[in-house]
Regions:
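C-terminal ends of transmembrane helices
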Residues: 17-28, 75-80
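Juxtamembrane helix-capping/reentrant segments at transmembrane boundaries
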Residues: 26-41, 85-110, 176-183
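Hydrophobic transmembrane alpha-helices
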Residues: 3-16, 39-73, 77, 119-163, ...
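Short linear sequence motifs
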Residues: 24, 29, 69, 83, ...
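A general boundary/transition motif marking the beginning of the first structured unit of a protein
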Residues: 81-82, 105, 109, 228, ...
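Membrane-helix interface linkers and caps
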Residues: 25, 45-60, 78-97
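Active-site pocket-lining segments that scaffold enzyme catalytic pockets across diverse folds
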Residues: 111-118
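Short, N-terminal intrinsically disordered low-complexity segments that are rich in Pro/Gly
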Residues: 3-8, 21-31
C-alpha cells in the first residue's frame, strides 16, 4: 500500500507543479481552492484504478463518495473564481512577495505545496480505504452508515451553496443576511456539509479495518479544526461582523454557528 500511496503523492505533485506554473503565468493562485476538492476526487479515482487484485464494492463506494463530493466542489469553486477573479485572501498572503518580485517562489512554497500536503492528509481516509478494499470487499452495514452520514453532508453542502448563490444573485438582497432555508438552522450549512461528508467517508474507511481508520483519523480531525477554528467559520465571520454589522449580530444570536439546530427566539 505504501508504494501506491507514494504513487498518489507523485501524481499530486505533478498536478500541483503544472497548476503552479499556470498561476505564475496568470499572476493569480486563487483557483487553488477549486483544486482542493477536485484533487481529492482525482486521488480517489487514482487509488481505485490501481487497487492490487481489483477494487471491491467497498472501494467503489468510497471512490464514488469522494469523487462526487470533490468534483462538484471543484467545479463550483472554479466557476466562482472565473466570475469574481483573484481572491483577496491570497492577494494579502502574497502581497509582500509580489512587491519584492518573489511571487513565483512564494506561490509554490506558501500556497501550492502547503495545500498539497494538507490535501493529501485530509483525503487519506479515502485513499487508504479504497486501497485496502480489494475485491471482493463488500459494503458492510458500517459502510452504509458512513454513506448515510455522507448523504447528509452533501445535502447540506450542495443545497446550502445553491441557496447562497441564488441569494447573492438577487440585487435586492445586497447588504442583507441570508437566514432562510438551511441557513435558518446553521450559519454555515456548507461547512457543516464538508464536516459530515468527510466523517462519513472516514466511517466507510473503517469498514475496511479499524486499523486503517485509526491511521487516517488525522484527516477528518484536521478538517474539523480547519472548518471551525482556523480558516472556516472563525475567519469568515470576522469579515461578516464588519460588513453586515448589527444584522449579522442578530443572526448570530438566533442561529447555531455550525451544527444545525432550531433557531433561538
Amino acid at each position: 500500500m505504501f508504494e501506491l500511496l507514494a504513487l498518489n503523492a507523485a501524481i499530486l505533485i505533478v498536478l500541483v507543479l503544472i497548476q503552479w506554473a499556470i498561476s505564475v503565468k496568470i499572476n493569480d493562485v486563487s483557483f487553488i481552492d477549486a483544486f482542493w476538492g477536485a484533487g481529492m476526487g482525482i486521488l480517489a479515482v487514482a487509488s481505485w484504478l490501481h487497487v492490487g487484485g481489483g477494487p471491491g464494492d467497498l472501494a467503489t463506494l468510497i471512490m464514488l463518495m469522494t469523487a462526487a463530493w470533490g468534483f462538484r466542489l471543484g467545479i463550483y469553486l472554479f466557476l466562482r473564481w472565473r466570475k469574481k477573479g483573484e481572491d483577496k485572501r491570497y492577494k494579502m498572503i502574497l502581497k509582500k512577495d509580489r512587491e519584492a518580485g518573489r511571487f513565483a517562489q512564494a506561490a509554490l512554497t506558501r500556497v501550492w505545496l502547503m495545500q498539497a500536503v494538507l490535501l493529501f492528509m485530509v483525503s487519506s481516509p479515502a485513499q487508504v480505504g479504497i486501497l485496502a478494499s480489494v475485491a471482493p470487499a463488500p459494503i458492510t452495514p458500517l459502510a452504509w452508515a458512513g454513506f448515510g452520514l455522507w448523504c447528509v453532508g452533501v445535502f447540506f453542502e450542495w443545497v446550502g451553496d445553491w441557496q447562497l448563490t441564488r441569494f447573492k444573485a438577487d440585487p435586492a438582497n445586497h447588504g442583507k443576511v441570508l437566514d432562510t432555508g438551511l441557513w435558518r438552522y446553521t450559519r454555515h450549512p456548507n461547512y457543516f456539509g464538508d464536516f459530515a461528508a468527510w466523517w462519513g467517508i472516514w466511517i466507510a474507511c473503517a469498514a475496511a479495518g479499524w486499523g486503517y481508520a485509526a491511521a487516517t483519523v488525522i484527516g477528518p480531525l484536521f478538517l474539523s479544526f480547519t472548518l471551525t477554528k482556523w480558516s472556516g467559520v472563525t475567519l469568515l465571520e470576522k469579515g461578516l461582523d464588519k460588513t453586515k454589522g448589527d444584522k449579522y449580530a442578530d443572526y448570530k444570536r438566533r442561529t447555531s454557528a455550525f451544527f444545525p439546530m432550531p433557531p433561538r427566539n
